[in-house]
Amino acid sequence: RNYYLKKQNTILNAFQTSSINNKIEIYNETTGVHFLMKIKSEKAEKDIINNAFSKGIKLSPLSQYYKNNEENNNIYVMNYSSLDSEKIELIVEKLKQCI
């Protein structure tokens, strides 16, 4: 449990101190090994997902769980359970390039 709490703190801190902090909102950061992240971007959700995938990042859009998904565009379920803590800064930097 402490292992994942430390990992969570590391990833949240990486996002909060990065230059994309003003382009994201993080929700439910106290719920296990995942949180929700809204990306404030003019880019379409599909484009962000494809750009991230091309950089080795798999994003899970919240919209896939809703019938009327327009309200939930660019909100992603961020699961960090298998994430290598040493690569968090690199992942944030790659994600920055996608949005």
Residue ranges of each PLM-predicted region?
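Short, solvent-exposed loop/turn elements at beta->coil junctions and helix N-caps
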Residues: K23-I24, S63-K67
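PLP-dependent enzyme catalytic core of the Aspartate aminotransferase-like
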Residues: S54, N69-I99
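Short, conserved charged micro-motifs
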Residues: E42-I49, S85-L90
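Short beta-strand-to-loop capping motifs
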Residues: M37-S41, Y80-S82
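Conserved glycine-rich beta-strand-loop-beta hairpin in the small C-terminal domain of fold type I
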Residues: Y4-L12, I24-K38
